[in-house]
Every structure is written in structure tokens, then in C-alpha cells.
Amino acid sequence: MIIEGLKLINFRNYEQLQLQLHPKLNIFVGENAQGKTNVLEAVYLSAIGKSFRTSKDQEMIFVDKHQAYVQVKVKRVVYENNIELRLNVDKKKNIKVNQVPLLKLGELLGNLNIVLFSPEDLKIIKEGPGERRKFIDGEISQIAPKYYYNLNQYNKILQQRNKLLKYHKGKKLDLEVWNEQLANIGASLIIYRRNFIKRIAILAKLMHRKITDGIETLEIEYKSSVLIKDHDTVDQIRVGFLKELNQSADEERRRGVTLVGPHRDDLNFNINGLEVKTYGSQGQQRTAVLSLKLAELELIKGEVGEYPVLLLDDVMSELDMKRQNDLIYHLKHVQTLVTTTMLEPLNIKNVQDKALFRVIKGEIGKYE
């Protein structure tokens, strides 16, 4: 799939922008705070329905304006999508796909698939379990919208259950109904996550072996907070989940919080048997994330039948020449949007299919 055109009105620092994109490599060059990342943010917003930089729609609206408009024209193998979003200062955003208003955010997912790679992605390795769960949830939701709905439902049930536990802290409390609901939805999430991690772990391992010339082996392991076996069915997981909720009931009442479930899941990243978070160098951590992102491209391709659009936000300059070469090699069949402050460090001399853009204060022109 490719993005043919992008239109922005009062989005971030763009009062008016109409841009035709190259079907392969698009490079946006400019100093900091000129609007390069804003272009990627608009594309991400069109795919996911929210920003990767802020949780507040108002921050994406041009100063002193009441509404921002984003339009992305997507060409897929067998059809086209026209995605439009209107962000409002004082009310919810409006989203249309092919002129049809969407009632729920989840209906947007899958109309445009993207993979984002930014310096912030090192958090997947370096920071806490919440960052890794966010990564899992975001990727599965793109290829399985049902997962997105189940996740929202699970979080609502979890929130209510935690309120009860907190309000009745230390007291006897009948949680049977809440336990059943949490286990039913939670088991479904665990199945999705287990299958996703199995697939992406295999792909990331292959990518990592290639990038490191076979010297390093990357292993990604799903750590479910509910005890599961490889071939457990959703019903077996549900039963096990319920059992663990019952076993932790006294401790949950004492602490006033739910201690078991997908909201406590994690991932382990190991290189040659050692945990990357603790023992990996900065270079190894970057390579692990690069391998993960390349694996995402292949996984989405296998799931939807075509490559997603790749967004690279100021990461090329952080990769050495070999890793740049490995990344560029995998971009031959992928439309890519790259931001950078300088063109010189990028190893793109031999790349013929590309468009270069200069970004200055919310204006985009050809790079001369």
C-alpha cells in the first residue's frame, strides 16, 4: 500500500499543505522544530486515530484555530481509501473513510497500516512493561480490530474491578461476576498476544541474524502473568485465569488492586541468552529494535497481503553504515517517509527511487 497524497489544514505548524508522495522513499530534510515530524504524525493519526506524541487533540491544532483537517489518500492493491480527520478544540474528532463517517475509532484500524520507528522506540527495550504492552497492543490492533475492541472492554472491566477493590480495601467482597467477565475477555487477549509474539519472534530472530552476520541470536519471549502452556485453548486459559484470580483474592483485597491478568504481561528480549535491557549495549539495543521493526513489516505483509507504510523519525543518523544498508535493503518494496536534519549522513547515493523535500517553518518544497 502507498500514500499518494497528503493534505493538511491548520495541523500543527501547517496552515495549508498539499503534498504528493513518491511511492518508494520520501526524505524530509530540515532543522529541528520546522515541521518534519508533524508530517509523520499526520500519517500516523490517519492510520491509528491518535498521535504518537500527545494524547491531546488540541495540541495538533494550529495556534488560535478551532479545527484542524487531515486527508490521506491511500492506494492499496485492490482498492483505494480516502481518509479524513477533523480535530476540534471543544469536541471529539470526526473521522471519515471514503466519505462514510466512522462511529468508533476502531473502525479506522486497518484502512492504512503503518510501522513507526523513532528514537522513542528504545523504550520498548529500556523501560518498564507498560511500554512493551503498548507496543503489543498497537501492532495487534492494526491487523486484528477485534483485539482492539476486546482490549477496551477488558480495561473497562478492570477499572471497575479495581474501583471495587480500592473502595472495599481489606473487606470481604464478592467478585465472582467481575472475575468471570475479566477472565472471558482476558483469555482472548492472551491468545492473540501469544500467537503474535510467536510469529514476530521468529521474524525478528531472522532479521537480527542477518544484521549481525550470524554473531548474535535475538530471542523474544512472552511473559504472561497468567500461567499458560504453548497449546492451551482459550477455554483452558480462561479456567486458569479464574483459578489465579481466586488464589490471589486475599492479597488483592489487602492491596486494593487486580494482581493477575494481561495488564501485567511483559516481554523478554535476550541476545545470546542475556537480557538486552540489563546487559545489552546501546548499539545492541538499537539493533534489537531495528530487527523488531523489520519483523513488523513482514508480519503485516503476511497478514494483509501488502507492505505497510514505514515512518522513520530521525533514526537513520543514529544507525551506523551497515545498519543503514540493512534497513535500506528492506525498503525496496516499502513506501517510506524519513525525517532527518542532514542529508549527508544518509547512505542513499545508490537509491534511485526517491523524493527529497526541504522543510522550513511549515512549508515543504523540493530539496535543491
From Swiss-Prot:
Any matching Pfam family: SMC_N
| Gene behind this protein | recF
Q: Which GO molecular function terms does the record list?
A: ATP binding; single-stranded DNA binding
Q: Which GO terms describe its cellular component?
A: cytoplasm
Q: Which UniProt keywords apply?
A: ATP-binding, Cytoplasm, DNA damage, DNA repair, DNA replication, DNA-binding, Nucleotide-binding, SOS response
Q: What domain of life is recorded for the organism? A: Bacteria
Which parts form a coiled-coil structure per UniProt?
none
Q: What is this protein called?
A: DNA replication and repair protein RecF
Function text: The RecF protein is involved in DNA metabolism; it is required for DNA replication and normal SOS inducibility. RecF binds preferentially to single-stranded, linear DNA. It also seems to bind ATP.
Q: Where does this one sit in the cell?
A: Cytoplasm
Position of the signal peptide? none
| Family to which the UniProt record says this protein belongs | Belongs to the RecF family.
